[in-house]
Design a protein with these regions (language model features):
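N-terminal glycine/threonine-rich, aromatic-flanked beta-hairpin/loop signature
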Residues: 62-110, 114, 181-227, 231
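Edge beta-strand at a domain terminus
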Residues: 138-172, 214-218, 222-223, 258-280
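N-terminal capping/linker segments that flank leucine-rich repeat
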Residues: 164, 254, 258-259, 266-345, ...
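Conserved hydrophobic position(s) of the canonical leucine-rich repeat
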Residues: 171, 315, 341, 351, ...
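Conserved hydrophobic beta-strand positions in leucine-rich repeat
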Residues: 316-321, 344-346, 363-367, 384-388, ...
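Canonical leucine-rich repeat
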Residues: 332-335, 354, 375, 396, ...
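Consensus "Asn ladder" position of solenoid repeat domains
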Residues: 349, 370, 391, 412, ...
Length: 520
């Protein structure tokens, strides 16, 4: 009796356990249905988020040109990067983080999106996944309206590195190992932030020269995978692919698994050293004026369309004076990117504004005969030469420019100018403005002074003469040929100037001016 009881008790326990297990399984599958592979849909959805690179195909390592990178986001969006030749379509694809969407049902992953106006779909079965590796079977895809069946087992590794910013800069190859046909110790590559690059070779003298026969030079980095393409003028597009093994401490290592026509394989590796960072491009974004860009690119430091940090440190002069047959520059925007500038020489253009507040080392500015209406010089304390003759200035602040020796602001629309703090002033021209008074600095070095075609007279002329230093020189004070001349200097004031060593001169005749018999 006892044995029978024990048997029934055991049987009940087993049935209860089975019932509980069945209930648990059913409850679990309602929330997290089992997939044919034994994986749960929820687990796949959780673990697939991130960046994955295809590395094996049917158990064999994929050559580098067959790699691609997929990045899955938690919201069902994804990107797909590839640069692959499709034999059945006889064309390359160039996908730089192309946007797609994805969905997961059971263990079936569907990727879809529009490319070139066509719906693209691909279907995979996830057979295994963890946080480092994933296995999928690529079953079929729809491309250009055609359906293609596949039975391709693809292995993926999770990509944690992102070298898309680290690669930007100028790199020089230092070492190469692998196939002889890839041997190259004579190359520089400049990777730019806009997805283009520049290729350089050494000439016979050992100088680096830009290879300028290429119409296209593009690249992208997705994670640790680099794809490049280029096209020689009149030639076909070329493609190349690399795994970036590391970028660290100014050194970059690439590797690529290649396959020969006979099916044998080899690995090529390159080691690069970083020569310099890229400071900026000579492009429309940084330099909106096309002629200014052209003039910059005529200089050695910018002839390849970019400026490195190393080159930037040596740029202290920008010369772009207008010459016959050249377009006039309308804007010098971008000049603020040159912090080492000491000289800007750009007379004879149509410049309307000039921002030099970031060029604190400037010593000389010449933008004569342009269309500048205002200029901020408060951040340029080292200026010693300033030529703004022939512009449209109505005011100017020189309070932070005490080192000026030569100051030319003639032929503007100034109603006032204060130069009293400029103690080293040697040459000063402020002719053809609307000045009604002018007090000169206490500068014993002052030698050249042109003030004609203004409105200085009477007590203001007395004050001007009183501020003249005692030395022999010439005061260009009147232009008798100008019917609009409003300066007035009397014979008594001419005599007062002469007593200090200054000869009053009529600009029209270049002769001594005797003075007026009346003050107004």
């Amino acid at each position: 009796m006892k044995a029978k009881y024990l048997f029934h008790t055991l049987l009940a326990s087993v049935m209860l356990a089975a019932t509980i297990g069945l209930t648990t399984a059913c409850t679990s599958n309602d929330d997290n249905p089992a997939t044919p592979s034994g994986l749960s849909e929820a687990v796949i959805k959780e673990k697939i988020v991130g960046k994955w690179k295809a590395i094996t195909q049917d158990g064999k390592e994929r050559v580098t040109d067959k790699l691609y990178v997929m990045t899955f986001n938690a919201d069902g969006t994804m990107t797909y990067s590839s640069s692959t030749f499709f034999q059945n379509l006889s064309k390359y694809t160039w996908r730089n983080k192309a946007p797609f969407t994805y969905s997961i049902s059971g263990n079936v992953l569907t990727r879809e999106g529009q490319e070139d106006g066509e719906l693209r779909k691909a279907f995979y079965e996830v057979t295994d996944i963890n946080y480092q590796e994933m296995q999928m079977v690529f079953t079929s895809y729809i491309l250009d309206g055609q359906t293609f069946s596949r039975d391709m087992k693809i292995g993926y590794e999770r990509v944690t590195a992102d070298y898309s910013e680290d690669i930007i800069g100028l790199w020089e190859v230092t070492e190469m190992t692998g196939e002889e046909t890839y041997n190259d110790d004579n190359a520089r590559l400049a990777f730019l932030a806009d997805g283009t690059y520049r290729y350089y070779r050494k000439d016979d003298t050992g100088d680096w020269q830009l290879v300028s026969t290429r119409d296209v030079e593009e690249y992208f980095v997705d994670g640790d995978w680099l794809a490049t393409r280029w096209q020689e003028t009149g030639g076909e597009m070329n493609y190349e692919w690399w795994d970036i093994d590391e970028i660290q401490d100014g050194q970059m290592k690439w590797s690529a698994l290649r396959e020969r026509e006979d099916g044998t394989r080899f690995t090529t590796t390159f080691t690069w050293k970083k020569v310099s960072d890229i400071a900026f491009l000579i492009d429309e974004e940084h330099f909106p004026d096309a002629e200014f860009r052209n003039r910059l690119c005529e200089n050695d430091y910018a002839k390849d369309g970019l400026v490195t940090v190393e080159e930037l440190a040596d740029v202290d002069i920008i010369q772009c004076a207008n010459t016959e047959g050249r377009e006039k520059i309308k804007s010098l925007k971008g000049i603020e990117l040159f912090p080492e500038l000491t000289t800007i020489w750009a007379p004879g253009n149509d410049i309307t504004e000039l921002d030099v507040t970031k060029n604190a080392k400037l010593q000389s500015i010449d933008v004569e005969d342009s269309k500048i209406t205002s200029i901020d010089l408060t951040q340029n304390p080292n200026l010693s030469y300033l030529n703004l003759n022939g512009n449209r200035l109505t005011a100017i602040d020189l309070s932070n420019n005490p080192l000026l020796r030569e100051l030319y602001v003639g032929n503007n629309k100034l109603t006032a100018i204060d130069v009293r703090n400029i103690k080293n002033l040697f040459s000063f021209s402020c002719y053809n403005n609307q000045l009604s008074e002018l007090i000169l600095p206490d500068s014993p070095k002052l030698y050249f002074l042109r003030i004609q075609d203004n409105q200085i007279k009477g007590a203001a002329m007395d004050a001007l003469i009183a501020s003249l230093p005692n030395k022999e020189s010439k005061l260009y004070v009147i232009d008798s040929a100008n019917s609009n001349e409003q300066n007035v200097i009397t014979t008594a004031q001419v005599a007062a100037a002469k007593a200090k060593g200054w000869l009053a001169v009529d600009v029209a005749t270049s002769q001594a001016y005797p003075g007026s018999d009346y003050e107004n």
